[in-house]
Amino acid sequence: MPYAILVVSALLYGLALNLPVGTMPLALLADGTAAPAVAIAMGSGMFAALFVSLPIGALTDRIGRLPMLRASAGLGILSLLGLGFAHGPVLGGILLGIRSIALVGYMTAEFAYAGEIASKERAVSGVATLGMIGNLTFAIAPAVSVFLWQHGIGREQYAWACGLAICGFALLFALPGKFDERRGRGTRAPILMHPRWYPAVGFALACTLQGGVNGSLAILTFHQRGIVNGAAIFTASAFTSFALRYPAGRLVDRFGPRAVAVPTALLSALGCVFAASAHSLLAVVFAGLLLGTSWAAVVPVALGLLFEHSSSRTRGAAMGAYTLAFSAGAATGATVATLATLAGGGYTIAMTLCAVGPLAVLPYVLRSRRSARVLRGLREVATPS
């Protein structure tokens, strides 16, 4: 029951908070904001997430999952309400940054709490499947927001959506405290980043590079190549990832993250290569299918590596490292896209570089060792009572 409550809360909250992704650029342009200023305002959320991921993870361990969940949900509602009335790139950028901080806090505490609900044998698939809700709301909400905008419903849609977010917020108070964990005062200093989390962070970052490049250049590049609907790469990837996330999580539960990391890295590299050379809609869709299959496993692989070296008392910090990895990967990918374009290689060179990333990090992941604590835990699970 707590897991179902968390899923419904995440669905309602995510649908509301992701509406501005689709129409805030249109709203800012309607205010007369120049295109570069719009890009900076929209990018403020990305950089806010980079700066706060680790501190929020440590704070989650300090105060507990439920307080962080509720505080983040409340902050997100306030930011959404503000976006319904704010005008101009400065105030809009600030509120988008606050929105991003709220989402990072919500997701960090949500995943840490869910990790305690699921059994040890299904911890990875349980948390990874919950992450599908975020992917689903990100796929649906911006498109719905644009549809509403096209039918004359502007910024007021954000204020109306606060109703959904408030419903999600209210559900959080139905979650039992027995799955919460906090360090409290008088304990050791909070952990921001443990060295044994580096393989998980590196792998997630390397596999997320392509997302930053595709978000920056894919549609424009495919349009220049004569492909009518280049956005098909995102559609194919999103639906494939959604369909395969739970099976991928169960594979990690069963065989461990390192065994699944090998085909994941290979599929990511192949997807990048096919996307770089795609000159037809069929090739674009095929590249999206490969990238979506890989992406379905990236999340559970990263979670599995993090769970190996984190306990209940450090799970918040581990999830902070998780959110940092994906935020940094997208930001780095966007930077790679910009540099490749300036160098004249554009999308082809950028995606080729992205293909190298997961393969380069893979040996580091395979060499990483489990902690003695986890090995003992696995032996206990394998020993019949």
Tell me the role of every PLM-derived stretch.
Residues 157-173, 351-366:
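Symmetry-related core transmembrane helices of the 12-TM Major Facilitator Superfamily/SLC fold
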Residues 105-118, 297-310:
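Intracellular juxtamembrane helix-capping segments at the cytosolic ends
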Residues 52-64, 149, 244-256:
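Helix-to-loop junctions at the C-terminal end of transmembrane segments
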Residues 25, 137-149, 333-341:
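Small-residue (Gly/Pro/Ala) motifs that create kinks and tight helix-helix packing interfaces
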Residues 1, 177-203:
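Juxtamembrane intracellular "pre-TM" segments in multi-pass secondary transporters
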Residues 46-54, 138-139, 238-246, 331:
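Residue-level signature of mid-helix packing/kink "hotspots" within the transmembrane helices
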